[in-house]
From Swiss-Prot:
Protein name per its UniProtKB record: Nucleotide sugar transporter SLC35D1
A single Gene Ontology CC term: endoplasmic reticulum
Compositional bias ranges of the Basic residues kind: 1-10
Pfam families, sorted: TPT
Residue ranges, annotated region (Disordered): 1-27
Membrane topology: Multi-pass membrane protein
Gene responsible for this protein: Slc35d1
Disruption of the gene: reported phenotype: Neonatal lethality. Skeletal development is severely impaired leading to reduced snout and body length, and extremely short limbs. The proliferating zone of epiphyseal cartilage is disorganized with densely packed round chondrocytes and little extracellular matrix, in contrast to the regular columnar organization of chondrocytes in wild type cartilage. Chondroitin sulfate content of cartilage is significantly reduced, associated with reduced proteoglycan aggregates in the extracellular matrix.
Length: 355
């Protein structure tokens, strides 16, 4: 009998020993802090992007509109130089790491440098031309274009609720634009081009980060580096460089401070965008930008100085804002449900494996 008893309790060869319930509980408790940290990092990345995006719009608006700085290209050039300088110093001091240049780097980054340049310049130009409420409401189109880009490049699908809220945002933008007394055709064209480029840039950044070839610092560095000389050439041949040199505000300390801040914020925003996209998604990054724009819309109405109030325009702005809030809520809840479903499937798979 003793022998039979020993055989019953002896582990079978090739079979893993069963885990005790206490051990399983310890594993589950050990996973909780890691999951909490991941959520915290996602929220931190999203918040960092929102604050950075808010500050750069306000500072750029002040430099280009309030001080009437004549060259959006030169502001963009300053942002590129600041990005390259900060990352080069960081790499030299071994604070950040990214691959050295080789002949494969252009292939690994393409088409991001072109999208980065176009996104930056059209964004600056439209900031100069449009009042802040209309600038922010027309930025809603970037969500629509991001959906198209993620569908085409990342094969993502979107629910009926998401599509309806995006439709509401676009309708609100059209209503607001129909009664925009400060209408500027160039500003409208540039902001819509900027929306397309923002969407394409976000989707491609996610694609490049997933490939893990250059990393976020490498993408930031080489995007800016490759476009410095082309931007300088364009600024020279269009006369923008000459206008910038002849600008009378260089003696103004407050202007110099804001111009420098604009250049540095260009790098910080690029970093925040890549960070938010890495920890979340291109669509989440766009949502955060959208929520930030709500704040800018109302601040621009009161303090912008170039907003002309009409009821139709005001109602259109608020329709778009309401749509963006509902959209953000639906997207967030869908993401949480998706994660819960994935976690449930993993547990089911483990349970079947244990049996």
């Amino acid at each position: 009998m003793a022998e039979v008893h020993r055989r019953q309790h002896a582990p079978v060869k090739g079979e893993a020993p069963a885990k005790s319930s206490t051990h399983r509980d310890e594993e589950e408790l050990g996973m909780a802090p890691a999951e909490t940290l991941t959520v915290f990092l996602k929220l931190l990345a999203a918040g960092f992007y929102g604050v950075s995006s808010f500050l750069i719009v306000v500072v750029n608006k002040s430099v280009l509109t309030n001080y009437r700085f004549p060259s959006s290209l030169c502001v963009g050039l300053g942002q590129m130089v600041a990005t390259v300088a900060v990352l080069w110093v960081g790499k030299t001091l071994r604070v950040v790491k990214f691959p050295d240049f080789d002949r494969n780097v252009p292939r690994k980054t393409f088409p991001l440098p072109l999208l980065y340049f176009g996104n930056q310049i059209t964004g600056l130009f439209s900031t100069k031309k449009l009042n802040l409420p209309m600038f922010t409401v027309l930025r809603r189109f970037s969500i629509l274009f991001t959906m198209f880009a993620e569908g085409a490049l990342l094969k993502k699908t979107f629910s009926w609720g998401i599509k309806m809220t995006v439709f509401a945002m676009i309708i609100g933008a059209f209503v607001a634009a129909s009664s925009d007394l400060a209408f500027d055709l160039e500003g409208y064209v540039f902001i819509l081009i900027n929306d397309v480029l923002t969407a394409a840039n976000g989707a491609y950044v996610k694609q490049k980060l997933d490939s893990k070839e250059l990393g976020k610092y490498g993408l930031l560095y080489y995007n800016a580096l490759f476009m410095i000389l082309p931007t300088l050439a364009i600024a020279y041949f269009t006369g923008d460089a000459q206008k910038a040199m002849e600008f009378e505000g260089w003696a103004d300390t407050l202007f110099l401070l804001q111009f420098t801040l604009s250049c540095v914020m260009g790098f910080i925003l690029m970093y925040a965008t890549v960070l938010c996209t890495q920890y979340n998604s291109a669509l989440t990054t766009t949502i955060v930008g959208c929520i930030k724009n709500i704040l800018i819309t109302y601040i621009g109405m009161v303090f912008g100085g170039d907003y002309i109030f009409t009821w139709t325009n005001f109602i259109g702005l608020n329709i778009s804002i309401a749509g963006s809030l509902v959209y953000s809520y639906i997207t967030f809840t869908e993401e949480q449900l998706s994660k819960q479903s994935e976690a449930s499937n993993k547990l089911d798979t483990k349970g079947k494996g244990a049996v």
